[in-house]
Amino acid sequence: MGVRKQTMVKDTAVPIENKKFTREKKDKEKDKKPDRERAGRKTGFFVPKKVETGKKGKLGRKSEGKAEEKAEGKAGISTSTISERAVLKPSAGKRKKAESGPGTKTGKKEKKQKKSFSSSLPASKFLPMSPEEVKARGWKELDIILVTGDAYVDHSSFGTAIIGRVLEDAGFRVGIIAQPRWDNPEDLKKLGRPRLFFSVSAGNTDSMVSNLTPGLKPRKKDAYSPGNKTGLRPNRSVIIYSNRIKEAFPNVPIVLGGIEASLRRFAHYDYLSDKVRQAILADAPADLVVYGMGELQIVEIAKRLQAGEDIRKIRDIPGTVWKMEVRAWKELKEKGKGTNEAVARDTAPEAAEFFKEYIEIPSFSEVSQDKAAFAKAFRTYFLEQNPITGKGIVQPHPKTVIVQNRPMRPLTEAELDHVYELPYTGEAHPSYTEPIPALEMVKFSLTTHRGCFGGCSFCAITQHQGRMITSRSIESVLREAKKLTEKPDFKGIINGVGGPTANMYGMGCRSWEKQGACLDKACLYPRVCPALDTSHKKLLELMKRLRELPGVKHVFTGYGVRYDLALEDEEYLEELCTHHISGQLRIAPEHFSKRVTDAMSKPGKKVYERFSEKFAAFNKKCGKEQYIVNYLMSGHPGCTLKDMIEMAEYLRDHGGYTEQVQDFTPTPMTVSTCMYYTGLDPFTGKKVYVAKDKKEKAMQRALMHYRSPANYELVYEALEKAGRLDLVGNAHKCLIRRKEKQ
């Protein structure tokens, strides 16, 4: 499974120059700009505000005291590459401003509000969550309302906060509705009708993962809700919220985003219902999906709606998913059936250009009935998630056709710096009377980079953030750290520095700029690729400078360390042991059976043993007593009872017994979930064993906790079933003692 071959010929990454199929510039329409054109309409998403307080700038409104110039060196995000390979024109001829407001679907003119809000209350540092907060800012209406399944925490570890601040920075008036009631639309009406659109997210995690255990039982805690309370978001939050919004405001555009919408953008296996569900845009009454890290996409959408475009015509933004009518799709396919490419180009140039840029995968009807077709569809779209060479994907559904545009490019270093230095308060909204546990975990942490080239089969980060690493500059991270030290509750400890993985900061590959991450091989599996720059030099410099900041006593890594990478740089490993571990280092070998680690695309136990030896040696050298805490997994595709017994024996022999154990949970768009549903490796076509029986899954988990008296019966039954009763008795090698069954 390590080598993932590509079966289709890729086109080059050269932008299409045919003006007929690129987004037309509106230079000739300068005299027809909308009344409320925003700051940041030049070339970038984030343009430093230079209007003076109290004077009207490009917003057409008073700047309301927020006109401080940004510090030098904070670059904006360029929009120049947004549509350079666009295939379908948003509309023929010049775009006309929608009569009833940007993006709306009615022809009626909106009535102007006669009453203007005014208040002597100071404007909150937070984005508004109530009509009173909107009023305190002197606003008549909001441009965009973000709806989320999480509590509102204004911290850069929370997706809603990032999107809200990015839109605010681009000049839009943004409000947030967090964890609304979903039995009726009233909560969704409290901030009124947004002028542009609603954006809907389930929160930082898929709502099914937030609400349910791997055994599909309700969770007892929800770290993203005040006081760990459960029941504050529905299952399938994105669909439910969208339906309630449509009831309240039938003609307001809805844009979906976040992890739940992103990873359900195609027909997908749904663990709760144990069946294949339609793409989320086929189930939710929404207009677009923003997939992946959505800063570039969401601001481009906002600007184009602001300019008067109909959201139904916005079809060329990378990193978005849109719907096509079944009839239109059939007509497009018919036009593209020319006897050869030249004929098709002459008779139906639009269709020919479309099929040059998009690939059709098996339809919902096919993948829901044929597991081999599901695996084929998965393999195709998995290999097209490269922002440099990836093509768009088309998947027909019974009542609509889902079209995913090619992925959006990653942010540059300067852009990422800018995003993470926006004016987050770093706190939960003051309306909450109980703490948000998820904030407590990251409050004094620093995000250094995005992306992960680890390639673990069960992880969706690659599909959401991409394999290519984008790192913040050292100076940007230091500026944020300095602000942390100024907080009154800072105790001198920075408890996390990293990203999806702690030690990929500053790493890269010489091929990424031209072709993106390789499609025919993984970066770390079955071994670290020699073309990868695995130097930890930049990370070491950052950690050293963080330690030297006044007021900082300790800087801990906090995030998971990729130990196969750490072995590539002994200087990093020594520094890690000397300065950056608080007593325990958490790593994730996940399993010790080769068959299972191969299915997971994880390094095997020999690599783990090398790391353990080095870790012990460096701890001895620096005179510290520190320990490894292993994260392990049961029930992963490819894992049998024999594999779990092998794991238990390894833990017995190496003293690695741990409580940090999780059952495999199938979540959309991961390789492991594809294997779980189909029983096939999507890259080789080989069959994969999958434990789906609840009893066997319980036995697998029990074997990792074989010492627990509560698991005796399950462990005994597993050993008996596997023919390993030699491990029952009083001998040293035995996992459990022989006794009469209770």
Curated annotation (Swiss-Prot):
Binds 1 [4Fe-4S] cluster. The cluster is coordinated with 3 cysteines and an exchangeable S-adenosyl-L-methionine. Disulfide bonds: none annotated. [4Fe-4S] cluster binds at C452, C456, C459. The keyword Iron applies. Residues 1-125 are annotated as: Disordered. Pfam families: DUF3362, Radical_SAM, Radical_SAM_N. Residues 129-742 are annotated as: UPF0313. GO terms for molecular function: 4 iron, 4 sulfur cluster binding; catalytic activity; iron ion binding. PROSITE patterns: RADICAL_SAM. Coiled coil: none annotated. Residues 1-128 are annotated as: Unknown. Residues 438-707 form the Radical SAM core domain. InterPro entries: Elp3/MiaA/NifB-like_rSAM, Methylthiotransferase_CS, rSAM, rSAM_horseshoe, UPF0313, UPF0313_C, UPF0313_N. Residues 17-40, 49-73 have a biased composition (Basic and acidic residues). Keywords: 4Fe-4S, Iron, Iron-sulfur, Metal-binding, S-adenosyl-L-methionine. Residues 106-115 have a biased composition (Basic residues). Its cofactor is [4Fe-4S] cluster. It comes from the Archaea. PANTHER family: UPF0313 PROTEIN YGIQ (PTHR32331:SF0). In the C-terminal section; belongs to the UPF0313 family. HAMAP family: UPF0313. This is UPF0313 protein MA_4618. It comes from Methanosarcina acetivorans (strain ATCC 35395 / DSM 2834 / JCM 12185 / C2A).
